[in-house]
Amino acid sequence: MRTVDITTKIETLREAKAYGRIRLKPETVKLIKENKVPKGNLVEATKLSGIFGAKKTGELLPFCHPIPLDFVALEVKVNEDNLEVFSTVRGIARTGYEMEALTAVTTALLNVYDMCKALDDSMVIEEVKLLEKSGGKSDWFRRLDGVKVNLHAENEGLRKIAEDYLKELGATFAEEAELYISIGDNLPINKEIRSLERVISLYDFRRNPKEVGKEIRVGWSDDALIIILPESEEKIRFFFETFGGIIGNLLCRR
């Protein structure tokens, strides 16, 4: 058993929202609305329990990565015969906040059950579900279906590695192309995309400081996107596994 390896993922702003509902007797709801539950203010305690649950997700679930939480909010809605909980969890991380949002809702509902168990033996937690998530790979990753690529490399082994990644992305190969990738040899770049190059360099350095100096260059030459990769299997795999999905985004924005 093991966790999913997220080493190659990019840290991005991510958000998840979840929902849950517990059914209660109308008499119990009345006590909640009148703030007469013996253990105290149920609504506020439920919000706090949800926040606490979100923070403890990585400890409760063995395969869930512990990730930083930049924002957690719980909304509690008291209805005639049920109580609804909505959670929002946000942060900058390599993986999403779905489990944190779901755990927040679940913990909040369990708190309702705990605070009311002496008052209501008919309670049922009816539903817990993810409402939405954003900021992950699905938001910015674009395949290269229909994109023509000119791939140049003297080293056949390195060429095959890059070719396999490009095929997996859906690219086709041609002499006249909209994307030119060179392994080892420089190609003329009229306008380098400095912001992306800096991000790539930063992530590259964090992965392996000993490889610093073997730069990956990205930019435009006329109407074609140019990518220059060093003759390094590690660098080639790093680029495609971490930033391969951004290539399609660049071409779409051109």
UniProtKB/Swiss-Prot annotation:
What this protein catalyses is: (8S)-3',8-cyclo-7,8-dihydroguanosine 5'-triphosphate = cyclic pyranopterin phosphate + diphosphate
Active site residues according to the UniProt entry: D114
Give me the residues that bind substrate, please. Answer: F63, C64, H65, M99, E100
**Which molecular function GO terms apply here?**
cyclic pyranopterin monophosphate synthase activity
InterPro entries under this entry? MoaC, MoaC_bact/euk, MoaC_sf, Mopterin_CF_biosynth-C_dom
- Kindly list the residue ranges recorded as spanning the membrane: none
Pfam families associated with the record: MoaC
Biochemical pathway: Cofactor biosynthesis; molybdopterin biosynthesis
- Record's subunit section: Homohexamer; trimer of dimers.
Query: What is this protein's record name?
Result: Cyclic pyranopterin monophosphate synthase
Q: Which organism is it from?
A: Aquifex aeolicus (strain VF5)
| The encoding gene | moaC
